[in-house]
Amino acid sequence: KERAWENVYDPVESELIRCALSGRFRINEHELANHYGVSRTVMHDVLMHAQANGLIVKDERSRWYSVPLDESRVNFLYELREHLEPVALSKAAGVIPQRELEQVDSRLIQALRRYPDLPADGLDQLELDLHVRCLSYCPNPELVEALKRTRCILIFGKHLLGREIALPHEEPFFHEHQRIIDAMMRRDGDAVAREARAHLDKARLKVLDRVRHTRSMGVPLDLPYAKEAAFAV
């Protein structure tokens, strides 16, 4: 059964990633709830999930702010991912069911055949397959939890790539994911970590280019619940 906050999470998430790309904004929870016609309780759940995904933070006075997604933060997030994600995926490789890996591999093969004719959420689902679903099998829950705040990188791609940012001429990451999944199916933890590091190294450069491009467009925000805020001194 879908929970109440899930009904409005995606559109709120889309607007919050745009806030993050534009800078630091104060997010008024009451006005946001009114804007979407839901209760404060429902909207608070939405914002708590956005916080877990690294989109917003709450200050000592319980005020919500977007976390700017600029080149510096992209580099910080990828530094964290490059340290932790290869380890987490290599650990997951030892326990994830073979059937799960075969299904992920099958979806990648289908996507390669169809690219660029994919549904709007097609790329996002493939990203989630590896970086969330497969990674969730890591037996170290602290690694999984630490990586949650880096999901704003995936959220950026989810809401902009193939929509406001044109899809690249060549497939964006399918072969890289296939090499990681193949190593996982062989239960070769060292190869999983090696392929994951290579993938993240390439992904960092692509995301940096896309973030620079999006921020350079300077599209003004017109959201009744978001007000540009100065950085704390």
Residue positions per predicted region:
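Conserved amphipathic alpha-helical segments that form helical-bundle/coiled-coil interaction surfaces
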Residues: 98-162, 176-177, 194-202
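Short loop-to-helix capping motifs
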Residues: 29, 140-141, 187-188
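Hydrophobic side-chain positions on well-ordered alpha-helices
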Residues: 15, 19, 114, 135-137, ...
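Short helix-capping and inter-helix turn/linker motifs at the boundaries of alpha-helical repeat units
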Residues: 3, 121, 125, 168-172
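C-terminal all-alpha effector/ligand-binding and dimerization domain
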Residues: 160-233
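Short linear motifs at protein or domain termini
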Residues: 1-84, 226-233
